[in-house]
Structures are given as structure tokens and as C-alpha cells.
């Protein structure tokens, strides 16, 4: 990765790292489950250090990619240790490469309805914090991760969902921590999204799915290769 950064920098290309969270995280979740299973017989505390899932979670959801197990459990302290550790490793690699780190993209998109609803840990956490719904749980995660990165001197980036449906006071707190919000789902009635995000105080980066996603078909004809969602 360090070689990639240096290769890109010589060609005036900025590489933006992304830690997909809390959704789209199946690879990380499964990797940390494997780590847990490998270490639990020796040191349970160490095994749980970066765990991203709760064994008692019975939440029923289906992601846009048809997964039922790709959402980090944001009530787990180990999730925040994981994000802290991974971001530190990213920062170190950029320093070793001698390349400035513009921002870390945290994802934030496509957390399906039903996530966390069957998690005993999430229910307990929400009750303790006086949260009314799981949206407030996701806002807690967002507040904490953006604050953590800010303390490291790193700006946050994210998909459009990170900037939507928050109270004004929350936007006022977190918008300055963002380098940019990537507005991707802007088709039809959603063409208002970039304006909404900008009006909430975030810098907008337009990445309209119909223009910039290279795996989409040019048109929906059956013989045209590519996706048409």
C-alpha cells in the first residue's frame, strides 16, 4: 500500500482510504470473528479486543447486497477500538510513504432497516443513553468516530447518509470535521440531496451514480453490459 501511495503521489493522484462502517462491513466482521475464535482459548479479553459483532444479536435485516450479517454492532466498545486501531495504522502508512493524508472516508451508507433491533447490547445501551430509536444509535457512532479522527488531526469523509436527518445542533458540531460528503444517490426526487447536504453546512462532492459509477450500463438494454439499479 505504501508503494501504491508513492506511485500515485508521483502522478498527482490522491488516494483516499475508506473504512466501511458501520454497514458494508462483512469482511471486517468475519475477520474479527476469526480472530476471536483463534484467541478465545488463550485470552478472552484479547479475543474480544476488536470484536465487531454480538453473538446474541438476532436482528433481521437484508442489505442492498443481500447480506444479513454485514453491520457492525455500534454498542460494542470494541468497535471503537477497531476504528481507532485501523485509523492509526492508516495514518502511519501515509507517514511512512511521505504522502499527506487528506481524509479518511468512513462509509456510513446503506445501513438497512432492522439493524440493531435484535441486539440486547444495543437495547441496553439505548436505554442507558435515553435514545428513542436506532437512528440515534447511528448518530452516536458518527459523533464518536468523527471526534476521534478530528483529535488525530484527520478530516472525515462519508457517503451522503452521514449528513442526512440530523438535528441542526448535531450538524453544527460535526460538519466542520468533514472534508466532504459524497452525494451518490441523486436520481429523480433525490436530486435535492446535494443541496440539502450543502445547506446543512457540509462540503459536497458530487459522485452521481448514473454518471460516475463505472459498473453501470450506459442504458438498460438487455444486451448492454453493466448494472442498471
What are these regions (language model features)?
Residues 1-152:
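Substrate-binding cleft of carbohydrate-active enzyme catalytic domains
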